Swiss-Prot record:
Alphabetized PROSITE patterns for the sequence: IMP_1 (PS00629), IMP_2 (PS00630)
Subcellular location: Cell inner membrane
Family recorded in the similarity comment: Belongs to the inositol monophosphatase superfamily. CysQ family.
Gene: cysQ
HAMAP family found in the cross-reference section: CysQ
Role this protein plays: Converts adenosine-3',5'-bisphosphate (PAP) to AMP.
Cofactors (names): Mg(2+)
Membrane-traversing stretches: none
Tagged with keyword NADP: no
Matching InterPro entries: CysQ, CysQ/Inositol_MonoPase, Inositol_monoP_metal-BS, Inositol_monophosphatase-like, Inositol_monophosphatase_CS
Enzyme class: hydrolase
Protein name in UniProt: 3'(2'),5'-bisphosphate nucleotidase CysQ
Membrane topology according to the record: Peripheral membrane protein
Length: 269
């Protein structure tokens, strides 16, 4: 595994931002869309940027394998030999890209021993880049400024602010929550961008009931971890990476703090 340095992190940030510029070019014109085997859309932008990221990361760290959402047919028997690898989603929020909402991002993370240790989330249409590295902290670059992202308390007397992907998702989440508490839902596309709402203090958590891949959560996990946050499944267990044949995550919660009694929002008293 490469040594975690600010130089490595800066190189990955630049690669993610370059990938974002390619997405911006595709965004300005009509793109070809087809459905994958899992019935999710993929565009020529996904495929082009996946190849771009693969080439750039290979040049940066030739010894580190790469797993992309668009090139994930690598058997577990081979992946089990990887101690470290790059995990990428070239276009997180493909449907948002197709719908021209601007709510999509590039996700790049470095995973070591089944846990992310470096992550970059770049939102090209928002002009924002979020990045973190183990032991380094979490930061946001926007409008020429680099801002250190800080932990924020959850106000017990206020409604819990929850990021979700749609109004339908909000109702699905509401159905499993403690009905004695108040909630405020914020709708946003792209799994990565929902996690940045938590990092920015707009939301207290992001709850996902539905299909996501490991590439959707890795960069967010290290971002929130460096802020003192937490990601867990509905059995209060951490997410893991590259341990199963499938890349599908369980339902999960991304929270801004480990010190909140998360179990109370799922149980009526």
């Amino acid at each position: 595994m490469p040594i975690l340095t600010t130089h490595l992190l800066q190189d990955v940030i630049e690669i993610a931002q370059q990938a974002g510029e390619h997405l911006r070019c595709f965004y300005q014109r009509s793109v070809t869309v087809r459905m994958k085997e899992d019935n999710t859309p993929v565009t020529e932008a996904d495929l082009f940027v996946s190849q771009f990221l693969t080439e750039k990361l290979t040049a940066l760290t030739p010894q580190i394998p790469i797993l992309s959402e668009e090139n994930c047919h690598i058997p577990l028997t081979e992946r089990q030999t990887w101690r470290s690898y790059w995990l990428i989603d070239p276009l997180d929020g493909t449907q948002q890209f197709i719908n021209r909402t601007g709510q999509f991002s590039v996700l790049v993370s470095l995973v070591k021993d089944h846990q992310p240790v470096l992550g970059v989330i770049h939102a090209p249409m928002l002009g924002s880049t979020y990045y973190a590295m183990q032991g380094f902290g979490a930061y946001k670059h926007h409008d020429g400024q680099h801002l250190k992202l800080a932990f924020h308390d959850i106000q017990a007397d206020n409604a819990l602010r929850i990021a979700v992907g749609s109004a339908a998702a909000a109702e699905k989440v509401r159905s499993i929550l403690n009905k004695n508490l108040a909630y405020e839902f914020h709708i946003c596309g792209s799994s990565g961008l929902k996690s940045t709402l938590v990092a920015d203090g707009v939301c207290d958590c992001y709850i996902r009931l539905g299909c996501t891949g490991e590439w959707d959560t890795a960069a967010s996990e290290i971002l929130l971890a460096e802020m003192g946050g937490i990601i867990f499944d509905l059995n209060y267990q951490p997410l893991t990476y590259n341990k199963r044949e499938s890349f599908v995550n369980p339902n999960f919660v991304m929270g801004i703090t480990q010190d909140f009694p998360w179990d109370k929002i799922f149980h009526s008293n």
